[in-house]
């Protein structure tokens, strides 16, 4: 069965640029009714919405300035009051900073879980909702291990475990909410620019050698994967998109 994005209301965290913005573009091209971009970056957010509305028509995209670690209640209330029903939440906001453990966990794990809980309860069919889909942006580092970025890897392992449990078949059948993960390989974004390991220059040089040998991809590749995953993935599953190749379940 292919799930259809036509007329769906979509919320994307970290949607002002990069993977989030590219995904909004692909979802609107597939017929989504509206994409609501929430992001702390107001400048890029305003530009993103202007570009999307210029391309797809007025009111197809909206930007809401938001710190995902602090503004969930206010922003979700605003969204639910205006749109009544949200069909898709994409938890895309994230950071890669080995020098700030607490912030990494707050954004990559805690906020992602909190937004998932809020929108899961909104979507629950047993709670008056209409069902829906939550897509969590994990990473190849949600299931692969190397020695370079343990804090980031730990955060993404948490996302994978959370997604598989929240999206468990039992829960999906009971509540009508599908939860899946997209696991991008190295992608050309601000997130992956100038990444520094925490320890020393020897480790940094080895990390950079690894990056040179790694297949890279563009944000559009991940956005297309987010469409493919929405259309075909079963709840509780996780999908790899790496080196611009077709998605593969992991």
Language-model region placement:
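Substrate-binding pocket helix/loop in short-chain dehydrogenase/reductase
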Residues: 100-104
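Active-site helix of classical SDR
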Residues: 116, 155
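Conserved NAD(P)H cofactor-binding loop of Rossmann-fold oxidoreductase domains
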Residues: 92-97
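Conserved glycine-rich Rossmann-like NAD(P)H-binding loop of the short-chain dehydrogenase/reductase
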Residues: 32-47
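C-terminal helical subdomain
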Residues: 181, 200-250
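Conserved glycine-rich cofactor-binding loop
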Residues: 16-17
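Residue(s) in the substrate-gating loop at a strand-loop-helix junction
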Residues: 139
